[in-house]
Amino acid sequence: MLYLIIYDVPATKAGNKRRTRLFDLLSGYGKWRQFSVFECFLSVKQFAKLQTAMEKLIKLDEDAVCIYVLDENTVQRTITYGTPQPEKPGSIII
């Protein structure tokens, strides 16, 4: 599944630290698309692990995180101008 994760964290000293930590966390799971937007192709297990980590990081009374779950049919119907359409990472064979 493709998870489109969009977040908004206040521009305060503490918020800036959380935003940086959230960016670093999401960078380990997916592709940074634009400011505060990540595309993450994840298994159910990976997504559960990411959710747990995000829930520990964000402040529910200050931050906003929206996660859109897109199945393969929806991803194939994505219209993209400019940069390439989201692609599922390929397998690495060693």
UniProtKB/Swiss-Prot annotation:
The keyword Metal-binding applies. Its EC number is 3.1.-.-. Mg(2+) binds at residue 8. It holds the Pfam family CRISPR_Cas2. GO terms for molecular function: metal ion binding; RNA endonuclease activity. One of its GO terms (biological process) is defense response to virus. The keyword Plastid does not apply. InterPro entries: CRISPR_associated_Cas2, Virulence_VapD/CRISPR_Cas2. Its cofactor is Mg(2+). Keywords: Antiviral defense, Endonuclease, Hydrolase, Magnesium, Metal-binding, Nuclease, Plasmid. Homodimer, forms a heterotetramer with a Cas1 homodimer. CRISPR (clustered regularly interspaced short palindromic repeat), is an adaptive immune system that provides protection against mobile genetic elements (viruses, transposable elements and conjugative plasmids). CRISPR clusters contain sequences complementary to antecedent mobile elements and target invading nucleic acids. CRISPR clusters are transcribed and processed into CRISPR RNA (crRNA). Functions as a ssRNA-specific endoribonuclease. Involved in the integration of spacer DNA into the CRISPR cassette. HAMAP family: Cas2. Belongs to the CRISPR-associated endoribonuclease Cas2 protein family. This is CRISPR-associated endoribonuclease Cas2 1. It comes from Synechocystis sp. (strain ATCC 27184 / PCC 6803 / Kazusa).
